[in-house]
Amino acid sequence: MYPTVAMVHNVGEKRRKQQLNDRPYFLCEYAHAMGVGPGNAEAYWREIYRYDSMMGGCVWEMVDHAVLHKDGSYTYGGDHGEWEHDGNFCVDGLFYPDRRPSTGADIVRFLYRPIRVSHLSGDRFEVFNTTAFSMNRYELTFRWNDGSVEVLVPDTPPLSRTEVR
């Protein structure tokens, strides 16, 4: 659990070079949603998408652990007279106790976006369809801020990349 990005990269490289078995590599946990979100998760997903042997991973943890107090506030870690502890691991989920999404949920939703766009150079961009489905259900258009160019992105097959100019 919690391998570094460099470790994930090394596993991907070794599998690409057939120095490891060809089973999919799954990160059972690679990020913790404490604070404002899962931290360096984008770097992990760059590595996951770089190698065919990568399968994805899980973020800990889904929902805050807190108790709704009769005054409407949420309580946790030492608020009920129990033995004091560090209290760092109760209100740290992607969703608040009432299931509203936190900032961390927005970050994860962005990480799992179905289409990724990268600037290659000049007027060249790469569109990456991260899903197992065709992009034909989407209409994706590039528009430059000055309105000078508008490009309709062609259908991109599942798990494929298309260059757009």
What are the residue ranges of the model-derived segments?
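Generic beta-strand/beta-sheet core signal
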Residues: 28, 60, 120, 128-130, ...
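Sterically constrained small-residue positions within well-ordered secondary structures
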Residues: 18, 48, 118, 133, ...
